[in-house]
């Protein structure tokens, strides 16, 4: 979607002086992306389902591209829709319309997650913003890193550093406010009355803690990105 914002993740990338190339696949397609030209691949959220190939014909190519990067040992990050596409890429099932979560949600780091660099600095429990109705089964080759009470498969890793995160760790409180205020009809469909009766209280209660956890995850992901030896 055009109003996707990388928030805390963008700040971490900029702090690491990353050179970022943007592709608006939903609007312009993917073109020819050469694996050797990039050190990492990040796929944020969006409105389609991960299997909506008829309306969004770029999705199969995106799934193949994510797997190509992951199989090459490069860092991959799929957020929300991106996580669902990564799960698809590694042979998992996409479960549509059965996993409604919205607003800041408690998450639990699994035993495998506590060993993973993305979650090593976090408390076993943390909060992060959610906005989805779909989920996925876990790829056979994946390690489950985080879960919630309602939706078990919240974060997984395949291989060295191909990560799928259902939750929006990158969305700071300010980003959430921009998203929800500019998509009021969509908010009302998933959480009727939330904007009027609960948004301010949820933000005041959870946003600061979620921002702190999200910033740690963002920095840790950036640290997984490996540059070619001749560029180090």
Question: Which positions does each model-derived feature cover?
Answer:
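N-terminal beta1-alpha1 cap of cysteine-dependent amidohydrolase-like domains
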Residues: 1-72, 193-232
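Short glycine-/acidic-enriched loop or helix-start segments at secondary-structure transitions
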Residues: 6-8, 32, 52-54, 87-89, ...
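Glycine-rich, phosphate-binding/catalytic loops in enzymes
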Residues: 12-15, 57-61, 94-95, 146-147, ...
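Conserved beta-strand termini and adjacent loop/short-helix elements that scaffold enzyme active sites
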Residues: 23-25, 97, 131, 147
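A short acidic, often aromatic-flanked loop/helix-cap motif at beta-alpha or helix-coil junctions
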Residues: 27-31, 102, 135-136, 152-153
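Cysteine-nucleophile active-site neighborhood
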Residues: 44-113
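Amide-donor transfer/coupling interface in amidating biosynthetic enzymes
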Residues: 110-232
């Amino acid at each position: 979607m055009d109003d996707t914002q990388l928030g805390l993740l963008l700040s971490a990338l900029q702090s690491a002086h990353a050179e970022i190339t943007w592709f608006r696949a939903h609007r312009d397609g993917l073109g020819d992306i050469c694996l050797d030209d990039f050190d990492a691949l990040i796929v944020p959220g969006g409105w389609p389902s991960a299997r909506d190939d008829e309306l969004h014909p770029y999705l199969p190519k995106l799934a193949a591209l994510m797997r190509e990067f992951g199989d090459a040992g490069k860092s991959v990050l799929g957020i929300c829709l991106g996580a669902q596409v990564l799960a698809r890429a590694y042979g998992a099932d996409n479960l549509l319309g059965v996993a409604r979560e919205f607003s800041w949600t408690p998450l639990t780091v699994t035993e495998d997650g506590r060993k993973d660099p993305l979650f090593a600095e976090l408390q076993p429990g943390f909060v992060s913003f959610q906005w989805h109705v779909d989920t996925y089964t876990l790829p056979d080759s994946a390690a489950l890193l985080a879960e919630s009470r309602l939706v078990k498969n919240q974060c997984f890793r395949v291989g060295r550093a191909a990560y799928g995160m259902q939750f929006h760790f990158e969305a700071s409180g300010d980003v959430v406010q921009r998203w929800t205020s500019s998509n009021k009809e969509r908010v009302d469909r998933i959480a009727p009355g939330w904007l009027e009766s609960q948004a301010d209280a949820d933000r005041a209660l959870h946003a600061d803690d979620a921002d702190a956890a999200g910033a740690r995850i963002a920095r840790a992901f950036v640290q997984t990105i490996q540059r070619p030896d001749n560029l180090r």
